[in-house]
């Protein structure tokens, strides 16, 4: 078994403080790209919490998971959305309901768990799809009927119905990562940070919570190797702190604050390259409709009308990001030009008076990041202008990502929350998190709408672009009507890297660690 330096809690419910790295990050010995180009050091905005592909928590974990548990396919680095095979020798859609695959021969699991087989593929996919397992990502395989094993290396994925996002948001994500059936069953059917039976281009060889994660090339991987012998991942929550670390020479690559892009592009640090990429992500103010103080839709609609979205976005991002109008980014079916509510403080005051909500007090939970705090302060001022007192509560990432979970004890006390979700290049990957099944999982607004669910399911099988556009616009209109959402921005993605590094990035700027190479 791979030895991991792993001190401290492993479940996300007790990781209050994971990733709270701050300026202390740079007290570590410098491990940025070595003179011989063997070690790459990058920043992650949160520490890892769960390595199980079926129960992963955040985007940074995705990159680690697909590096250590070989997926069937992965996205291709570059400016076009496409994919390439990793664990499979071949994979093709035979018809609307059938996908045939054959694994590469000789992919082994560590710790004596033997060769990867089609039986492991069947187990890995079906455990995500099985409702009994309550995977947050069951929607990725909602159309699955079964995986049929043909022989040791080949099989068929059978679908119950056509599933349009399969090649965009299911197969090229950790939803196609293959774990060892034997190993996972021995661990009780799921795992958190255990690194048993790894199989990918890299192995996770060291994890010091809140400090670093080390990936090392898998010596038994016989196919395309990762670009660096080692990748050191430092969890640094605040992008401004990461930018200082980059300028100090402690990092080879980091995402930047969106608000820093104008400054960095105008005056980049010596030996660096500054990147700006279009973003699929979305940022919004969520309102918990089951909270006792916010159950009246008139109060929630008042909050919508109280928020000056343009001022919030301009203040938080220094003019570097545009106002967004939903959860679906420009360029995708369902992208909207406007929301169905507007900034109207007088209307907000009238709705509050009608609801008898004089002297309303609310809390606003945010991640402890400078951009989030600036946005929250503008929201706080907007609410004060209509007579609502708002207390801002800052959280580190380990705490923040548990706030709305039904497994915790805070979800009914949650009132307002400023959130950002990453995205895949299909609108269904935005809408899925707000279905009734996601209430208390990722649907922290506790928005429960049967029409919304029916439209989401319709969008998964509809291939006509115009009809999909109508469906996803209608879904976002229902979110507007609930009063539980104030959509703010899709941001842009800013990054900076040393000119000695050729980063592997998706078209939206998200990293593909195994595709980073020396320049």
For the regions a protein language model found, what residue spans apply to each?
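Aromatic- and charge-enriched surface segment that lines or borders ligand/interaction sites
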Residues: 90-134, 156, 242-245, 293
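Ligand-site clamp/hinge motif
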Residues: 218-264, 389
């Amino acid at each position: 078994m791979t030895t991991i330096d792993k001190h401290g809690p492993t479940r996300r419910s007790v990781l209050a403080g994971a990733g709270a790295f701050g300026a202390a990050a740079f007290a570590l010995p410098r491990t940025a790209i070595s003179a011989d180009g063997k070690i790459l050091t990058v920043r992650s905005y949160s520490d890892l919490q769960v390595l199980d592909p079926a129960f992963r928590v955040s985007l940074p974990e995705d990159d680690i998971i697909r590096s250590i548990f070989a997926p069937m396919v992965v996205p291709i680095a570059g400016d076009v959305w496409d994919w390439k095979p990793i664990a499979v020798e071949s994979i093709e859609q035979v018809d609307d309901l059938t996908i045939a695959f054959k694994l590469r021969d000789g992919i082994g699991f560590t710790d004596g768990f033997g060769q990867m087989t089609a039986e492991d593929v069947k187990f890995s996919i079906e455990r995500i799809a099985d409702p009994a397992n309550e995977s947050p990502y069951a929607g990725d395989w909602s159309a699955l009927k079964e995986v049929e094993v043909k022989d040791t290396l080949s099989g068929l994925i059978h679908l119950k119905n056509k599933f349009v996002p399969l090649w965009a948001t299911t197969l090229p994500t950790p939803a196609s990562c293959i774990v060892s059936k034997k190993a996972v069953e021995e661990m009780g059917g799921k795992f958190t940070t255990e690194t048993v039976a790894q199989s990918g281009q890299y192995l996770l060889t060291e994890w010091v919570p809140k400090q670093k994660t080390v990936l090392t090339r898998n010596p038994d991987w016989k196919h395309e190797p990762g670009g660096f012998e080692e990748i050191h991942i430092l969890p640094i929550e605040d992008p401004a702190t990461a930018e200082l670390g980059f300028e100090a020479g402690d990092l080879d690559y980091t995402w930047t604050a969106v608000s820093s892009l104008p400054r960095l592009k105008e005056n980049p640090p010596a030996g660096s390259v500054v990147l700006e990429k279009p973003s699929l992500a979305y940022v919004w103010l969520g309102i918990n409709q089951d909270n006792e103080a916010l159950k009246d839709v008139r109060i929630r609609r008042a909050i919508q009308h109280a928020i000056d979205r343009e001022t919030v976005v301009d203040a938080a991002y220094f003019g570097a990001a545009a106002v967004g109008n939903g959860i679906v980014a420009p360029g995708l079916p369902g992208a909207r030009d406007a929301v169905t509510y507007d900034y109207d403080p007088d209307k907000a005051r009238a709705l509050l008076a009608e609801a008898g909500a004089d002297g309303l007090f609310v809390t606003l939970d945010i991640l402890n990041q400078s951009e989030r705090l600036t946005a929250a302060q503008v929201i706080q001022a907007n609410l004060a202008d209509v007579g609502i007192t708002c207390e801002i509560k800052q959280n580190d990432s380990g705490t923040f990502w548990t706030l709305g979970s039904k497994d915790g004890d805070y979800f009914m006390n949650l009132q307002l929350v400023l959130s950002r979700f990453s995205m895949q290049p299909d609108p269904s990957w935005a809408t899925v998190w707000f279905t009734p099944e996601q209430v208390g999982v990722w649907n922290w607004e506790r928005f429960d709408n049967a029409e919304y669910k029916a439209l989401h399911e319709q969008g998964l099988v509809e291939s006509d672009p115009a009809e999909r556009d109508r469906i996803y616009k209608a879904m976002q209109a229902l979110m507007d009507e609930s009063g539980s959402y104030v959509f703010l921005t899709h941001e842009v993605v800013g990054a900076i890297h040393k000119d000695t590094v050729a980063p592997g990035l998706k078209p939206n700027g998200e990293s593909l660690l195994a595709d980073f190479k020396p320049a």
